[in-house]
């Protein structure tokens, strides 16, 4: 385990040496995701606790799986040398330009609802780690692609929120997995203004919004995400192409694909909100 920049382990309470000692000899049991957290349940020799390596990409992080002789990746912060079940060597490389992301070893705890910890956890059906979640991610609710996503609970939360619907969509304790890009796209598809109070949405409109979120996230996953530069790639280092499907985000000044009116960008919470002023009117 090579650590080039200790800042990438800032959420690991034991420091660099503890991270290295825990990972050396550990066996990766699976890969699980909830929202923007990704974790690898571990079997650590001599360790009775259920542990996992937890990763968060922050704004610019990447987790790449490389062959040992592959060219060095710029801005690599951590390298974990692996041996596959077939005896082949590989490298897990954590790359992060802005160092907002992190890796950490965290203890696993039972999920609140007794169901699998997150998306893809089902591949290990019957495994001891299946219904566990890292303590660092326990406060994050399920995302709309999760098989155990509780739509009724989210709709009930909407009814209690007077905040703008975009702010609610980005609240990881209401639902997870939605960033600025996909929030703008879901709101455009649903004809909703970003500042429309969540509580004013009818049940039908709220359900329509959640369904649009699901469809957009599913398509984005299928197309490898939205890659605008070298910071956004999959585990094999390949760029996604969902950017060609965008209707609102980054389309400032271009005609709306629905009505032809120019897409507008408003400054919002230190970022931007992209919307059609004709299709997405604020209704009071």
Question: Which residues make up each language-model segment?
Answer:
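A cross-family signal for N-terminal binding/gating loops and helix N-caps
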Residues: 1-103, 255, 271-284
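Basic, nucleic-acid-binding surfaces and adjacent catalytic neighborhoods in DNA/RNA-processing proteins
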Residues: 2-22, 32, 48-50, 153-284
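Intrinsically disordered, low-complexity regions
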Residues: 16, 40, 47, 62, ...
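Intrinsically disordered, low-complexity regions enriched in small/polar residues
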Residues: 21, 39-41, 66, 94-96, ...
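Phosphate/anion-contacting hairpin/loop surfaces
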Residues: 48-177, 182-189, 197
């Amino acid at each position: 385990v090579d650590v080039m920049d200790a800042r990438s382990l800032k959420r690991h309470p034991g420091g660099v040496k503890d991270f290295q000692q825990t990972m050396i000899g550990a066996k990766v049991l699976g890969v699980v995701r909830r929202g923007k957290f990704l974790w690898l349940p571990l079997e650590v020799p001599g360790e009775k606790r259920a542990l996992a390596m937890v990763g968060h990409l922050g704004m610019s992080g990447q987790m790449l799986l490389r062959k040992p002789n592959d060219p060095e990746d710029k801005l690599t912060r951590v390298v974990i040398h692996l041996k596959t079940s077939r005896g082949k060597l590989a490298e897990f490389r954590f790359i992060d330009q802005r160092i907002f992301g992190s890796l950490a070893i965290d203890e696993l705890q039972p999920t609140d609802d007794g169901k699998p910890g997150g998306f893809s956890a089902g591949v290990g059906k019957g495994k001891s780690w299946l219904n566990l979640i890292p303590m660092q991610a326990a406060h994050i609710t399920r995302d709309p692609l999760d098989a155990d996503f509780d739509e009724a609970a989210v709709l009930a939360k909407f009814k209690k929120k007077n905040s703008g619907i975009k702010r609610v969509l980005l609240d990881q304790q209401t639902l997870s997995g939605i960033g600025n890009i996909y929030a703008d796209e879901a709101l455009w598809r649903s004809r909703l203004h970003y500042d429309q109070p969540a509580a004013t949405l009818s049940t039908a409109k709220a359900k329509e919004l959640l369904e649009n979120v699901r469809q957009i996230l599913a398509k984005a996953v299928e197309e490898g995400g939205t890659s605008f530069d070298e910071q956004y790639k999959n585990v094999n280092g390949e760029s996604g192409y969902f950017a060609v499907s965008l209707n609102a985000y980054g389309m400032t000044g271009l005609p709306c694909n629905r009505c032809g009116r120019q897409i507008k960008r408003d400054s919002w919470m230190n970022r931007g909100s992209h919307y059609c002023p004709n299709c997405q009117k604020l209704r009071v």
